Swiss-Prot record:
One of its GO terms (molecular function) is 3-isopropylmalate dehydratase activity. It holds the Pfam family Aconitase_C. Belongs to the LeuD family. LeuD type 1 subfamily. This is 3-isopropylmalate dehydratase small subunit. GO terms for biological process: L-leucine biosynthetic process. It comes from Shewanella piezotolerans (strain WP3 / JCM 13877). It catalyses: (2R,3S)-3-isopropylmalate = (2S)-2-isopropylmalate.
Length: 201
């Protein structure tokens, strides 16, 4: 997992509440167990007019030229609700998104995102609305998410603070997933195992 320190990028708006994991990555694309290759199916039922994915929906923001290359998604409350499929953050990350900004997230999606290096940022509804308005008004303008400083900077330069658990922040800053976190304590684990009584080893 790559460390997340700060990221500046183009933001794309999905101005909907209760975006669920079946909308993020529909169930027919869940047969893979590796993390790659899901980006093409992200928001499939919204991005395409046909089941095969051959006819892009020109009205969906991710298909609009002004949002090409977007790496930050801004949405409304309860993002990532629904089933607990880890494929949802996989699809978002595989598409190239680095951070999701919303007033609230479903708890399981929030944890899955952090575990997969995708930063979920909680701002107030008013702050999210301001960022959306600025992104809409200023095509090509960037948003900055700074995990070190715990701030989001809007296209106009407004700075908003956000909170995240220190353990999650540490893992993201250092690029540590569950395996990486275990390996980081490898010496302590080895020392503990070496000192186990023979009957417990």
């Amino acid at each position: 997992m790559q460390p997340f320190i700060a990221h500046t990028g183009l933001a794309v708006i999905i101005d909907s509440a209760n975006v669920d994991t079946d909308q993020i990555i529909p169930k027919q694309f869940l047969s893979k167990v590796t993390r790659d290759g899901f980006g093409i199916h992200l928001f499939h039922d919204w991005r395409y007019l046909d089941d095969a994915g051959d006819q892009p929906n020109p009205d969906f923001n991710l298909n609009k030229p002004r949002y090409k290359g977007a790496s930050i998604l801004v949405s409304q409350e309860n993002f990532g609700c629904g089933s607990s499929r880890e494929h949802a953050p996989w699809a978002l990350a595989d598409f190239g998104l680095k951070a999701i900004i919303a007033p609230s997230f479903a708890d399981i999606f929030y944890g899955n995102s952090i575990n997969n290096g995708l930063l979920p940022v909680k701002l107030t509804e008013a702050e999210v609305e301001q960022i959306m308005a600025e992104v809409e008004a200023l095509p090509g303008a960037d948003v900055t998410v700074d995990l070190q400083a715990l701030t989001v900077t809007s296209p106009s330069g407004s700075v908003f603070s956000f909170e995240i658990a220190e353990s999650a922040r540490h893992n993201l800053l250092n690029g540590l997933d569950a395996i990486g976190l275990t390996l980081a304590h490898g010496d302590a684990i080895s020392h503990y195992e070496a000192n186990l009584p023979a009957w417990r080893a």
